Swiss-Prot record:
InterPro entries: Chap_CCT_alpha, Chaperone_TCP-1, Chaperonin_TCP-1_CS, Cpn60/GroEL/TCP-1, GroEL-like_apical_dom_sf, GROEL-like_equatorial_sf, TCP-1-like_intermed_sf, TCP-1_chaperonin. Belongs to the TCP-1 chaperonin family. Component of the chaperonin-containing T-complex (TRiC), a hexadecamer composed of two identical back-to-back stacked rings enclosing a protein folding chamber. Each ring is made up of eight different subunits: TCP1/CCT1, CCT2, CCT3, CCT4, CCT5, CCT6A/CCT6, CCT7, CCT8. Interacts with PACRG. Interacts with GBA1. Interacts with DLEC1. This is T-complex protein 1 subunit alpha. GO terms for molecular function: ATP binding; ATP hydrolysis activity; ATP-dependent protein folding chaperone; ubiquitin protein ligase binding; unfolded protein binding. It comes from Cricetulus griseus. The modification N6-acetyllysine is found at residues 199, 400, 494. The modification Phosphoserine is found at residues 6, 544, 551.
Amino acid sequence: MEGPLSVFGDRSTGEAIRSQNVMAAASIANIVKSSLGPVGLDKMLVDDIGDVTITNDGATILKLLEVEHPAAKVLCELADLQDKEVGDGTTSVVIIAAELLKNADELVKQKIHPTSVISGYRLACKEAVRYISENLIINTDELGRDCLINAAKTSMSSKIIGINGDFFANMVVDAVLAVKYTDLRGQPRYPVNSVNILKAHGRSQVESMLINGYALNCVVGSQGMPKRIVNAKIACLDFSLQKTKMKLGVQVVITDPEKLDQIRQRESDITKERIEKILATGANVILTTGGIDDMCLKYFVEAGAMAVRRVLKRDLKRIAKASGASILSTLANLEGEETFEATMLGQAEEVVQERICDDELILIKNTKARTSASIILRGANDFMCDEMERSLHDALCVVKRVLESKSVVPGGGAVEAALSIYLENYATSMGSREQLAIAEFARSLLVIPNTLAVNAAQDSTDLVAKLRAFHNEAQVNPERKNLKWIGLDLINGKPRDNKQAGVFEPTIVKVKSLKFATEAAITILRIDDLIKLHPETKDDKHGSYENAVHSGALDD
């Protein structure tokens, strides 16, 4: 009779692995929990080479953690997904997912099958999304620009720039509106990547500025070049303009010394011909990711053109998109000849080198294909500037989402409290096992208002109880349905009408975080077996070099 199948590794199954996964998820959530809300605290992360990052952003914290546990990795990837999809709500999505898992584990311990819990969670998530879209949405058209500013301020309130929320909120809204364009379907689009953010340490936060145009952190290649060009025709090149040298390994046998001079002359002429082809199309601004040597700069100075070298590839792509230029990595065409055509040029009203703050920058203004904007951030040190950039990115994404979806929901725990009451009542109408799972889903959502209150040093039990009472009244009594806008005022420690207070979040942030958190919790909940293989050991006859020396294997 054959023995049991042996697996070359560790295997844990059933309740043990489920408890491990829940603990791993809870420990990840506990790391970011204290950073949630307008009075959340920051984290300092030091990597293996000593680089320091100080941040409040959930996605950044989890990205910099080196997590080994596979279930914990799921939550780290979840925060990253929320950051890419929506741009905000990364901390809350992880906290909700961990709480859903914890409560699901309690149910499983009470002998309720994970499949029943999973179907209950899916049903609860679907109902929650439907309830938000039918009852909690505020249309932005009735609120106008103030709504955008308030949504940006809500996003910034927990960040380092929250203290200057009014100043930065206006800057962010202006920047997003400046890069608006209409796509082929006639839909307005707001590409956040078109807003270039530059950082310069020194001065205070409020000396940051918004510039109309794309700001390049470069200067012209030579002092003899013009510093301002009107009606610019821009060539975007992804190669160096330097004297052509023959590749290593190429051997040329010469009998006549004059031939050597001819070869050197031809090397110079190849680059000169390329530059002449570019200038012949009317190009007067040349941007390249590579270098430009002195010989080539001379031709540009004589032609009165502006040449900029060592432009970042990222910046070059954005400028090409904004101006309508083509990025060329070579001038060679399909026939093997080198050509450059006028259609490859981008256009802008003006390209100018200006001194802004303490540095010289090149500004590309009023580009032809799309408009662009740049924000120059000032701060006390590099850590502060980096965190300001992350905060602004979140705020830009929030404003973009509000403009595209044209709807917001009240913040400050209002949505979670309303959903919790609704789902509890909904659970009692279910006559199946899913009832318990839906009730636990409802209880899990209260982790957000609870955490907000705890981080603000308030009595969370008292505050959340009051909040639930208001929302219960709003849902039971149709005459008092305006109470559904009630959320937490964390500074004064009492419930308030967050619609009047202007605490708004994009609807998509709430909807996506609910969906993502539910899916992540379900993914981890389905796991009931973990097999961890042992690392493979190489069958080396002599082992290391030292062992080989001692064994005499190297003597032959």
